[in-house]
Structures are given as structure tokens and as C-alpha cells.
Regions:
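The feature represents the membrane-entry module of six-transmembrane cation channels
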Residues: 1-406
Length: 406
């Protein structure tokens, strides 16, 4: 009763949340945080990174001590000469090629930006306009059988009044009877569908924070070993720490691709009889509701005299159930699910990759210019680190566009 009292009447609902009770509540929370707060979190990260840069540049604050960094372009020039390449122009004529130049670096801006991103991602919904959401555990009475049955029968009406249906998707979503019940209600009402794979948000967080930790590890090495340390030490530290988030992202991409293939196979072979339900007594309630939604014109399908088999257990209309199964296998519901997943690799979006690149690399580029003199190595490094993610982002968008039209 106390849980049901948390709900309130509404004429219109922004979000109808469909989920499996067996899935982790933390994963569902993170999925919703990424859906609602990711853009706000990225903007907050970039703004805080730029503000930190301006304050550090002005000398008004100091967050981390500076460590000596390599003269990247001079080292590159020496490597070219050592390999036998002799460019027709003298690279040493450029100010950033001064062999005596000693850049310094501290990942202050990136640390501030990443912290802002994580905080706003997890708590940003408290700063935005309220969103009305249908959550079955709260909006359907769980202890009074009559009120529970009335709420179940009215699910399609909740969806009619909902602008969008969000599906917290995991591999077993289409194996859960109640999830299929909500999907059937959506099919009968025509609401928009959007899939939220539950592992997407943890991957974005782990990869983004992982790259920041990698840069901090590089900084700690430079701070204690300095440029005069082991020539290969920085490379070993950098590769080791960058490998963790990189391999994690690759592993998730493979997992997401398999998840998409399984989703395609599940939709192709979908049958309501293969679904599972914690309480067996709920099955007849659910199937009767689906029967009423998919009966011709909203009425039960008329049965020819002497026919048998049109009605299954507890008066369930098997033809109506078959209509719903056909809709999932190849009808409008099938097309909406496939459209929501998209043609990107697996269930990983280009948007998530761009989110990681811009939130990590732009503040990182600013860190190289905090003590720059306007003519030296930092400004060039800043320019290249700033431009590279843009080029990478555009290439991802082009690949996604080609995949979508092919």
C-alpha cells in the first residue's frame, strides 16, 4: 500500500518504463541516468574544464603540481632523421621544434571535467524539469488482487497516454511474460519504442573514467621519474593503463553484437508459450488481456459453429495470441524494435563513443596549454589533440551514415 501511494493521477505520461524485475536495479538506474543526463553531463564537463583552464592559466588557483613532459615534435623530428628520412624543409625553423623547449603538464582540467561528468550524470535529473513515468511496481497495486487485475487490464490505456516506451533491455527481456505483456499493450496502442541496453551506461562510465585514470597514471610517472627516467617507462605505463578501458570497450562491442544477433533470433522465433513467469497464476490474466487487445476490432474473434481450438486455457483466444506473436516476429512491433536498435554495430551507439572522446580529450588538450607561452609546443599539442577527436568523430558519423543507407 505504501508503495502504491507513491503514485499520483496524471492525464499524460512522458515515459512508460518496461523492465524485468530480475535485472539489477543499479543497471536500470544507470541506464536511465545515461538516457536523461548524458548530454547535460558532457556540457557540464566541458564548461567546468574550460573554467578550470582559465583559472589555472590566470594563476589564481593551482590544483596539481606540474610535471615535465616530452618535447613531442622535436622527438619526432629526431626519430625521422634516425630512420633516414630527410624532409626538404627544416623542421627546426618552427618555434615548437626548439630542442631546448621543456613543456610541463598536469591533468587538472581533465580531472575536474571527468568529476563534473560523473556527478551530473548520476544526479543531473534533480536539476531538470520533472518527468512523469509509469513504473509498474508503483502504479499497479501489488497486494489487492482486484485492484491489481484492474491495473493490468488498463495497461494499454497507460501506454496510449504515454509519449514513449523505454525498454530496459537485457538478453532475457523477451523471455519474461510480463515484459511481453507490456510490449503487447504498446502494440495495441501504437506508442513509440526506445531500447536501453543495460550494459551501455556502465561501459561508458568505465571507459571514460578509465582513460582519465590512464592519463593520471602517465602524469604520476612523469612527476616522479621525470623526462630523465627510463626511455621506455612512459610508453609502458601509457600502453598498460590505456589497454584496460580499450579492451573493455572492445569486449563490450563484441558482447553487444552478440546481443543484437540474439535479439534478432529471439524476435524471429518469438512465442508467448516460451515466456517465463514467477507466479504461474499470472499467466491466464496476462494472456486474457492480450487476447482482448488483439481480438478483431477490439472484440473477441467470432468462433465458427462446432469449431474447437480457437479458445485455449481459461478462455484465451489463441488466434489473438497468434496475431500478437506475428506482430513481434514481423509486424509493426518488430519494425519499431529493429528501428530503435538501429544499424550501428551491436547495441553500441556512435553517440556514446563521441561522448567519451569529447569529454576526455578536449579537457586533456587544455591541460597542455595552462602554462603555454602562446608560441611553443603546448599550443600545437592543444590544436592536434583538439582536432583529432573531431576527425575521429566525423569518421564514426560517416561510417554510421553509410551503414544506415546501405
Amino acid at each position: 500500500e505504501a508503495t502504491f501511494n507513491l503514485s499520483q493521477p496524471a492525464d499524460e505520461i512522458d515515459i512508460f518504463l518496461s523492465h524485468s524485475w530480475r535485472d539489477s536495479g543499479l543497471l536500470k538506474y544507470l541506464a536511465l541516468c545515461l538516457y536523461f543526463n548524458s548530454v547535460m553531463a558532457m556540457v557540464a564537463a566541458l564548461i567546468s574544464g574550460f573554467l578550470a583552464f582559465l583559472l589555472l592559466r590566470s594563476g589564481k588557483i593551482t590544483l596539481l603540481p606540474f610535471a615535465p613532459f616530452m618535447n613531442v615534435f622535436n622527438d619526432f623530428n629526431e626519430a625521422m632523421h634516425a630512420a633516414g628520412f630527410r624532409p626538404s624543409y627544416d623542421l627546426n625553423q618552427f618555434p615548437w621544434m626548439d630542442p631546448a623547449y621543456k613543456p610541463i603538464y598536469a591533468p587538472s582540467c581533465q580531472l575536474v571535467a571527468t568529476s563534473a561528468f560523473v556527478i551530473v550524470l548520476l544526479l543531473g535529473h534533480h536539476l531538470r524539469a520533472p518527468v512523469t513515468m509509469f513504473l509498474d511496481k508503483v502504479c499497479i497495486h501489488q497486494t489487492d488482487p482486484q485492484r491489481k487485475a484492474a491495473g493490468i487490464q488498463a495497461i494499454d490505456q497507460f501506454l496510449v497516454r504515454s509519449k514513449k516506451m523505454l525498454i530496459c533491455y537485457n538478453d532475457d527481456y523477451f523471455e519474461r511474460l510480463w515484459c511481453c505483456f507490456e510490449l503487447a499493450a504498446r502494440a495495441s496502442s501504437g506508442s513509440e519504442i526506445e531500447m536501453l541496453p543495460l550494459w551501455r551506461a556502465p561501459v561508458v562510465l568505465v571507459v571514460l573514467v578509465g582513460f582519465t585514470v590512464s592519463h593520471i597514471a602517465e602524469y604520476v610517472y612523469l612527476l616522479f621519474a621525470g623526462v630523465g627516467g627510463s626511455p621506455n617507462g612512459f610508453t609502458i605505463v601509457s600502453i598498460t593503463f590505456h589497454a584496460i578501458p580499450t579492451l573493455f570497450m572492445i569486449e563490450y562491442t563484441v558482447l553487444a553484437t552478440r546481443q543484437k544477433l540474439k535479439l534478432t533470433d529471439t524476435l524471429r522465433t518469438f512465442k508467448i508459450t516460451n515466456t517465463k513467469c514467477f507466479d504461474p497464476s499470472d499467466r491466464s490474466i496476462v494472456e486474457q488481456a492480450i487476447s482482448s487487445w488483439f481480438a478483431g476490432g477490439g472484440e473477441p474473434v467470432s468462433e465458427p459453429e462446432g469449431s474447437s481450438g480457437l479458445r485455449g486455457r481459461a478462455g484465451v483466444d489463441t488466434r489473438a495470441i497468434e496475431r500478437f506473436e506475428g506482430d513481434v516476429r514481423g509486424g509493426m512491433t518488430h519494425r519499431m524494435i529493429v528501428s530503435s536498435v538501429g544499424k550501428q554495430p551491436g547495441l553500441l551507439r556512435v553517440r556514446d563513443l563521441l561522448l567519451i572522446f569529447y569529454t576526455v580529450w578536449i579537457p586533456c588538450s587544455l591541460d597542455f596549454s595552462v602554462r603555454g607561452v602562446g608560441r611553443g609546443n603546448e599550443m600545437v599539442v592543444t590544436f592536434m589533440i583538439f582536432v583529432c577527436p573531431i576527425a575521429q568523430g566525423l569518421s564514426f558519423l560517416i561510417v554510421a551514415w553509410v551503414a544506415s543507407v546501405s
